[in-house]
From Swiss-Prot:
This is F(420)H(2) dehydrogenase subunit C. Pfam families: Complex1_30kDa (PF00329). InterPro entries: Complex_I_30kDa_subunit-like, NADH_DH_suC, NADH_quin_OxRdtase_su_C/D-like, NADH_UbQ_OxRdtase_30kDa_su, NADH_UbQ_OxRdtase_CS. Transmembrane segments: none annotated. It comes from the Archaea. It catalyses: methanophenazine + reduced coenzyme F420-(gamma-L-Glu)(n) = dihydromethanophenazine + oxidized coenzyme F420-(gamma-L-Glu)(n) + H(+).
């Protein structure tokens, strides 16, 4: 299955949920997904299109647009294609359904994204800090408005 066929399948199955789908290169495709359909789209990708490997989950902060993005890189062992699936989230309440039940390895990726960007993954089995100390929870150090040193928390760490 080539990139064009994958995009056609996604947009055909989820016409209201998939937008801005395109081919970056013969082996790289991208698409935006409605945040409320992201888990369902991931289930379809894995179950019907053989996108069986979640490579990463991360975040991107766009303060000028007042939003964050949850970014998923999903690959297929059957097709030489990697899909970058993005979901736009409001910056003041960035929530999206966890995909741990679809891709087990999303567990730590989502935890890291939560503690660094503040993206809340609903129904995550154990959404707690992964690498940062407990007193930094709520600081969201990878957001662009994070003040860094010498803010209150960073000063206490040194």
């Amino acid at each position: 299955m080539d990139a064009r066929t994958i995009i056609e399948s996604l947009t055909g199955k989820f016409p209201e949920a998939i937008s801005e789908a395109g081919i970056e290169s013969p082996i790289r495709i991208r698409a935006y997904v409605d945040k409320d359909k992201a888990k369902e789209v991931c289930e379809y990708l894995k179950g019907s299109l053989q996108f069986d490997h979640l490579c990463s989950v991360s975040g991107v902060d766009y303060p000028q647009r007042d939003e964050l993005e949850a970014v998923y890189h999903i690959a297929s062992y059957d097709h030489p294609v990697v899909l970058m699936l993005k979901a736009r989230l409001p910056r003041d309440s960035p929530e999206i359904e966890s995909v741990v039940s679809v891709y087990w390895n999303a567990n730590w990726y989502e935890r890291e994204t939560y503690e660094l960007y503040g993206i809340f993954f609903k129904n995550h089995p154990e959404l707690k800090p992964l690498v940062l100390p407990d007193d930094m929870l709520g600081e969201w150090p990878l957001r662009k408005d994070y003040e860094g040193f010498p803010n209150r928390t960073a000063r206490n760490l040194v």
